[in-house]
Amino acid sequence: MASHILLVGIGGFCGAIVRYFFSRKLNSGKLPVGTLTVNLSGAFLLGAMAGANLSTTTTLLLGTGFLGAFTTFSTLKLEMAQLQLKKEHRLFILYTTITYGGGIALAYLGYWLGSFFR
C-alpha cells in the first residue's frame, strides 16, 4: 500500500510540474491553450493506457499520478467561468466544445490505439 502511494506521489509531482510548464508557456492569449493542450493530450494518453491494459504499477505511476496531476478539471472550470465573466461567449463555446468533444474523441482514439499493445 505504501509503495502505491509513493508511485502516485512521484507521478503526481512530475505531472504537476509539466502542467505548470505548459500553462506558463501557452496560456498567454484569450484562449487558455495550455490547459486545453494538457487536458486533450491527457485524455488521449489515459485512453491509450486503458486500452493497453497496463500493469497496476504503471497505471498508478503514470495514469493516477502523472496524468491525474497533468490534467486539470478545476482550472478548466475557472477558465470557463472567466471567459463567461469577460463576456467572451464565442470563446467559451469554442473552448467548451473542443475540450469536451475533443477529449472524448481522443480518449476513444487512445483506447483504440492502446488496444493494439495488449
From Swiss-Prot:
It holds the Pfam family CRCB. It is a multi-pass membrane protein. InterPro entries: FluC. Keywords: Cell membrane, Ion channel, Ion transport, Membrane, Metal-binding, Sodium, Transmembrane, Transmembrane helix, Transport. One of its GO terms (cellular component) is plasma membrane. It is found in: Cell membrane. Signal peptide: none annotated. Na(+) is not transported, but it plays an essential structural role and its presence is essential for fluoride channel function. GO terms for biological process: cellular detoxification of fluoride. GO terms for molecular function: fluoride channel activity; metal ion binding. It catalyses: fluoride(in) = fluoride(out). Na(+) binds at G68, T71. It comes from the Bacteria. The chain crosses the membrane at residues 2-22, 31-51, 56-76, 91-111. Fluoride-specific ion channel. Important for reducing fluoride concentration in the cell, thus reducing its toxicity. This is Fluoride-specific ion channel FluC 2.
